[in-house]
């Protein structure tokens, strides 16, 4: 059995394996939502050969064919988990481990597990994932002979605003910079304490906006050969694809080589892009994580990254998509996209944190450092999912059997029995389960309803999406919150559409081509930044190193940012005293920042938190006393977690008690150790 994280990856491997196994008379099967019922039934009737499947489809097998599982997998010898790094420390990973461990108990045999990944650094976590009982028995096989060279360039651009280049958007603000040259001029003026002249000028609608400038650069750099251009949001990908389509039309290009590939586009659109790349067509594709995995798209000359990703691992994974041919270098062009200076700019924004993070990620990548996997979360929501799954599969069982199956011999061995009992009581009080006079636990009507829903197979939270169609053409899907009213416009697949009709029952939006546009909001959350990345950002800001991979504008911008930080003594002073408030740069990761905010809130101190700074609404004396208490570890992390506003993060969290939510959030969102280290650093006790 081959387990892959994406249907597209499974389809790709299926095509390769089917040809490979044809002459050996080894049947190859695939099982996911797009595979016909006939093909699935053929596998269930005569199991054997190779099965390619996603965790969610394996879940559906347990749910819908529970009594046939022993027969289907009776001779399972090997399990290959592709892109192993994408599962470890993640909801889907815990879900997959639970299913595999349940499977071994049902078929009473232990198949050999193998994990494949190009970006693994935390081998201890990888070993535990494959064999919790005896992780020392897991063998690590590394390619230590690889000497592939890499070429990196970092460029700086003002961040395009959502309305950039949109004639329907009114420009009623000050005239702000649209190039790095103008950003530097403004930054130098601000450093002297003055206000840039352009802010005083009347608003100007400038055709050379930040979006157009960036698009023209991309058109110059990526107009030949095959390239992948990764963005951190589908919104930016759509904006740039549309801008380039307008440029191509206006300038009468013979062809527009810029296409899109992301999860909101239809399968047909994505597969067409993959096919054209694979046959060697010179295309540059704006994409998100959908092409980060190992789908076969042929040779890619270079990789673009618009805005730094959240992790070094993601940067390495994306860079690895290029330079796969013998003798070729892997090429990365990283664009930092910071907000241009304006009258509303914060001090943090003037430090260009995107540029600092871009450099920090490259430096850590060159040092061969990758983030360790986060295995602190107890994954209570996924445990609830698996309890419901077992009850649906079996029809009911005793609490002791559930405990043995999922905790003692399953994927939730770290969960205390007391917490497990609290979870069962919570499911009972919420009427998802009920207990028979015999002691057996079964699904209550609400539990039956939940496990029969289409989205139950996934342990992670989904969103309601509408299909976007032009006649019979399926363009893609958009979240419900992104659908504009009838008569208004949207962007999808780099094209402009007008909404003609919305069918809320069928979840379908009918559109026609149009000239107006409105960039869709796809949702999503900010990623988690590791403490070492934040610390490296500080080193970049305070150091004097010259980074040879910085393009001229990026190097000059770093000089300007360093001069501004030096003038304000940002890295010398513990905080910037503003009378009734203090601005602090903790240089810690996301968990440390959240914990510092929670500590302040617990003592009644109001704070405003940005990505790398916190403004404390108090005077210097109070903040010194407060941070001293933080540094001395006088806070209880579960008490801090009780103050978190949005406690429910995962799919079934709403069925957990506050006590369990606080326990979970104290580990998955907060880190008292990081906060203590940061407070000591702020107070000069590093």
Q: Model features per residue range: what roles?
A:
Residues 1-59, 63-394, 400-443:
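Helicase motor core with emphasis on the C-terminal RecA-like subdomain
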Residues 32, 140-145, 256-258, 263, ...:
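A generic structural motif
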Residues 159-162, 447-454, 517-520, 621-627:
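Short, charged/polar, Gly/Pro-enriched secondary-structure boundary elements
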Residues 194, 328, 463, 503-576, ...:
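Terminal, basic amphipathic appendages of nucleotide-handling enzymes
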Residues 293, 411-412, 497-498, 507-508, ...:
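Short beta-strands and strand-coil junctions in structured, solvent-facing domains, enriched
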Residues 312-314, 322-353, 360, 369, ...:
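Long C-terminal interaction/binding lobes of large macromolecular proteins
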Residues 369-496, 501-502, 578-587, 591, ...:
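C-terminal accessory/connector segments of nucleic-acid motor ATPases
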Residues 554, 559-564, 570-603:
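C-terminal helical accessory/scaffold domains
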């Amino acid at each position: 059995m081959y387990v892959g994280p994406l249907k597209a990856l499974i389809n790709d491997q299926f095509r390769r394996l089917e040809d490979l196994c044809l002459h050996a008379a080894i049947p190859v099967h695939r099982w996911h939502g797009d595979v016909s019922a006939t093909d699935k039934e053929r596998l269930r009737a005569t199991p054997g050969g190779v099965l390619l499947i996603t965790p969610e489809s394996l879940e559906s097998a347990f749910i819908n064919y529970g009594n046939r599982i022993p027969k289907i997998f009776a001779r399972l010898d090997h399990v290959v988990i592709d892109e192993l790094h994408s599962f470890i420390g993640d909801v889907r990973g815990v879900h997959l481990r639970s299913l595999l461990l349940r499977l071994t108990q049902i078929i009473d045999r232990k198949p050999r597990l193998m994990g494949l990944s190009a970006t693994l650094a935390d081998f201890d976590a990888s070993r535990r994932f494959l064999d919790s009982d005896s992780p020392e028995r897991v063998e690590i096989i590394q390619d230590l002979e690889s000497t592939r060279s890499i070429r990196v360039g970092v460029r700086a651009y003002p961040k395009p605003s959502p309305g950039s280049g949109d004639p329907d958007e009114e420009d009623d603000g000050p005239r702000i910079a649209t190039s790095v040259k103008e950003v530097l001029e403004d930054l130098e003026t601000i450093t002297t304490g003055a206000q840039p002249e352009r802010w005083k000028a009347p608003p100007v609608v400038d055709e050379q906006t930040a979006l157009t400038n960036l698009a023209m650069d991309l058109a110059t750099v990526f107009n030949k050969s095959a390239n992948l251009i990764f963005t951190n949001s589908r919104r930016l990908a759509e904006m740039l694809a549309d801008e380039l389509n307008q440029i191509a039309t206006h300038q009468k290009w013979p062809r527009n080589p810029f296409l899109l590939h992301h999860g909101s586009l239809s399968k047909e659109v994505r597969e067409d892009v993959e096919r054209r790349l694979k046959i060697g067509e010179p295309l540059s594709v704006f994409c998100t994580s959908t092409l980060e995995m190992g789908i076969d798209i042929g040779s890619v000359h270079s990789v673009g990254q618009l805005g730094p990703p959240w992790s070094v691992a993601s940067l390495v994974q994306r860079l690895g998509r290029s330079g796969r041919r013998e003798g070729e270098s892997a090429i990365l062009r990283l664009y930092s996209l910071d907000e241009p200076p304006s009258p509303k700019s914060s001090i943090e924004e003037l430090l260009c944190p995107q540029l600092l993070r871009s450099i920090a990620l490259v430096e850590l990548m060159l040092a061969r450092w990758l983030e360790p996997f986060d295995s602190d979360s107890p994954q209570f929501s996924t445990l609830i999912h698996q309890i419901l799954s077992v009850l649906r599969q079996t029809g009911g069982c005793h609490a002791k059997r559930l405990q043995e199956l999922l905790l003692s011999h399953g994927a939730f061995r770290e969960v205390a029995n007391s917490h497990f009992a609290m979870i069962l009581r919570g499911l009972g009080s919420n009427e998802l389960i009920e207990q028979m006079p015999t002691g057996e636990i079964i699904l209550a009507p609400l539990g039956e309803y939940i496990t029969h829903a289409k989205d139950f197979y996934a342990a992670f939270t989904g969103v309601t999406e509408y299909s976007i169609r032009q006649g019979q053409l399926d363009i893609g899907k958009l979240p419900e919150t992104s659908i504009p009213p009838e008569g208004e416009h949207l962007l999808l697949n780099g094209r402009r559409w007008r909404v003609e009709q919305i069918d809320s029952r069928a979840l379908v939006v009918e559109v026609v081509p149009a000239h107006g546009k409105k960039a869709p909001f796809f949702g999503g959350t900010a990623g988690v930044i590791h403490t070492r990345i934040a610390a490296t950002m500080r080193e970049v800001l305070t150091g004097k190193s010259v980074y040879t991979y910085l393009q001229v504008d990026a190097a000059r911008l770093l000089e300007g940012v360093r001069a501004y930080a030096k003038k304000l003594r940002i890295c010398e002073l513990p905080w910037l005293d503003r009378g009734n408030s203090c601005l602090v740069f903790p240089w810690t990761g996301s968990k440390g920042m959240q914990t510092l905010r929670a500590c302040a809130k617990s003592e009644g101190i109001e704070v405003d938190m940005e990505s790398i700074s916190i403004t404390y609404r108090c005077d210097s004396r109070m903040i010194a006393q407060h941070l001293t208490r933080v540094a001395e570890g006088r806070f209880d992390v579960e008490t801090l977690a009780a103050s978190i506003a949005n406690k429910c993060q995962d799919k079934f969290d709403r069925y957990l008690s506050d006590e369990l939510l606080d326990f979970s959030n104290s580990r998955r969102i907060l880190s008292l150790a990081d906060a203590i280290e940061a407070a000591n650093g702020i107070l000069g006790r590093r």
